[in-house]
Amino acid sequence: MTRRRAGGPSPPYGSTMADVFPPGFFDRADPTADTAFYDVPRLVTHIDDAAIAAVGAVYTELGVDGEVLDLMSSWVSHFPVTPRRLVGLGLNATELAANPALADRVVHDLNVDPRLPFPDAAFDDATCCVSVDYLTDPVAVFREVARVLRPSGRFVVTFSNRCFPTKAIRGWLSTDDDGHVQIVNAYFALSGGFGEVRAHRRAGRGGDPLYAVWAARPDPGPPGG
């Protein structure tokens, strides 16, 4: 897997959401409650088999394992080998119940409350697959992910070019795939909880492209070191 710095410059130190994203960036065509939109279970995959395999390859190459939080989870998590303990947080209880890889399931709407219902340093790694484009307060969510990660824990965000357009934020819909990488890079940088942001891109030949952007919570090292 080719690893590179995430495309585009990171926002300058001290930047705020208003400095980086224009007014209306996080608006959506359908502003109604996500719980209503996702009330009916969708036991289908949202990317093709090649892109699914690419997600699994990213997890394997990065060694995502241990106690892992699968953010905005559903009925499948795309891990070739299930982590030791996988916790799924999503919107639909039926979808989460159908996911055999999950050890624990939490129904929680991040667009209503971006706070994660977990203690500090609860997970070794975290993932978010093809869902980051629906977050209306993503920097708050990324900050929370950093809080619940242990030092050196990675947050791996994967996405393609498919979405539910009425629920995706306006800024995402108006941007191409390279722009999406830059958007996620900005989320990491603005959260203030992660180190260097890395990216992997698979162009896809006639199928769904797959992009991965990730960063780790810094490890401060031993006390007094």
Where on the chain are the PLM-derived regions?
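Class I SAM-dependent methyltransferase Rossmann-like catalytic core
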Residues: 16-63
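Class I SAM-dependent methyltransferase SAM/SAH-binding core
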Residues: 50, 54-57, 61-116
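Short alpha-helix
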Residues: 54, 58, 175-201
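A short acidic, Gly/Pro-enriched loop at the edge of an enzyme's catalytic core
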Residues: 113-126
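A short SAM/SAH-binding and catalytic strip from SAM-dependent methyltransferases
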Residues: 124-139
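A short glycine-rich, Lys/Arg-flanked "PGG" loop and its adjoining helix->strand segment in the class I
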Residues: 139-154
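Conserved class I S-adenosyl-L-methionine
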Residues: 154-185
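Core SAM-dependent methyltransferase catalytic element
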Residues: 192-193, 201-225
